[in-house]
């Protein structure tokens, strides 16, 4: 120790720093996912319509289609997860140590985000298939389009599908944020 100072090496990994941007983006995206799934569920639940026909009243309900039931269930699952994720993101903003700060919980967050994204796109695409046939019919199977008859029902279903697509985009972006947090944790590992 003859007065020589040791220069720090810039190639060494430093301590893991807190990244408030991950938590802020995560909170915003989870709130948007929450709002989109609520809108999709409410629109689908309000989509019942009864119209008079020659054979008596005809009621179009989401409960009559298994694809629409899965649509409501899938959106409900993501709604619960988004609500819990929003709480976790709020806590991580205040405590500076949230689920994206530790490797194990960041992996769990990433996997849950990915599964919820898959559930949303599955529910949305299944309902979209039924809605497409309802709007355009299937001429080779002699299925007529029902949307000219129950137009309000179809409008609500269309709104729910648009909300689910928005929810999927927000949930997929949450998955990207979780993957980015995992990348930061992996590159700053000692």
UniProtKB/Swiss-Prot annotation:
Superkingdom in the source lineage: Eukaryota
Chain ranges on the Cytoplasmic side, renumbered to this chain: 1-24, 92-113, 180-190
Residues that span the membrane, as ranges: 25-45, 71-91, 114-134, 159-179
Pfam family, one: CASP_dom
Keyword terms, alphabetized: Cell membrane, Membrane, Transmembrane, Transmembrane helix
GO CC entries: plasma membrane
Subcellular location: Cell membrane
Extracellular side of membrane: 46-70, 135-158
Membrane topology: Multi-pass membrane protein
Family membership: Belongs to the Casparian strip membrane proteins (CASP) family.
Matches recorded under NCBIfam families: A_tha_TIGR01569 (TIGR01569)
Subunit structure: Homodimer and heterodimers.
UniProt protein name: CASP-like protein 1U3
Organism name: Physcomitrium patens (Spreading-leaved earth moss)
């Amino acid at each position: 120790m003859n007065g020589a100072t040791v220069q720090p090496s810039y190639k060494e990994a430093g301590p893991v720093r807190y990244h408030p941007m991950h938590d802020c983006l995560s909170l915003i995206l989870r709130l948007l996912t929450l709002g989109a799934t609520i809108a999709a569920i409410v629109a689908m639940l309000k989509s019942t319509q009864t119209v008079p026909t020659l054979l008596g009243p005809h009621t179009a309900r989401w409960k009559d289609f298994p694809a629409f039931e899965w649509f409501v269930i899938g959106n409900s699952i993501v709604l619960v997860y988004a609500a819990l994720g929003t709480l976790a993101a709020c806590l991580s903003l205040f405590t500076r140590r949230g689920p994206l700060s530790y490797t194990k919980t960041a992996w769990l967050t990433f996997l849950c985000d990915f599964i919820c994204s898959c559930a949303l796109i599955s529910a949305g695409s299944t309902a979209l298939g039924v809605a497409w046939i309802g709007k355009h019919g299937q001429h080779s199977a002699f299925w007529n389009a029902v949307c000219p008859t129950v137009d309000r029902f179809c409008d609500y279903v269309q709104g729910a599908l648009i909300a689910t697509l928005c929810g999927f985009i927000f949930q997929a972006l949450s998955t990207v944020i979780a993957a980015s947090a995992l990348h930061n944790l992996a590159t700053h590992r000692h």
